[in-house]
Amino acid sequence: MLTVDYDRLGVRRGMSVLDLGCGEGRHAFEAYRRGAHVVAVDLSARDLATTREWCAAIRLAGEAPPDASAAAVRADLRALPFPDNSFDRVIASEVLEHIPDDASAIAELARVLKPGGRAAVTVPRWFPERVCWALSDEYHANEGGHVRIYKASELSDRLEAAGLRTIGRGHAHALHSPYWWLKCAADETAAVRAYHKLLVWDIVKRPRLTRWAEKSLNPLLGKSVVLYVRKPA
């Protein structure tokens, strides 16, 4: 399940791609399959181990070109261990909302992005997220949870303050918003479990009907907002 549109970001074979806050690697995998030189970064040793295992499986299955590469690095997004201007593309998907000092993480993203390079930054969208916060304290108050809700304009301002220029916006995962509202309101009921099964089925099978429905609903109900930015050359 990808939040970032790779065609819109312009990820191509041979590019260096940094996936910040990679989790278990979902965005790193797609860049790897496209032939990029991928570096996936996270603080979780467990998630990085999973990322390495899946990248190895992708290579073994022949799903990545032989000249592509993938590495997983444990690092703090506020102090990245890379030189300035290192990466053609940077992805930060659903991570900034977890970081109290997001300004430092954004500054590091901008620092390691090459001049003329592009980045995609995704966060939970304001309205669906506000509903979740209103329905459940546990949703955001647990350790490592969400510490803020962004408006798209606010996130754009923060990225531009770091020297980046917003070049596009998108929304994703409209079918996931009602699931999280149900889960926040009712926790693990039969309805919530059934909805979760529907989402898993949709992710695996990607039927035309649900793909069309989500694409149509994304502008209104998209769970995530995606900002595409560019570092001036």
Name each model-derived stretch.
Residues V38, A119-A120:
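A short hydrophobic/small-residue beta-strand
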Residues M1-P83, R89-S93, A103-I106, V147, ...:
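Conserved N-terminal segment of class I S-adenosyl-L-methionine
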Residues T122-P124, A172:
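Alpha/beta-hydrolase-fold catalytic nucleophile elbow
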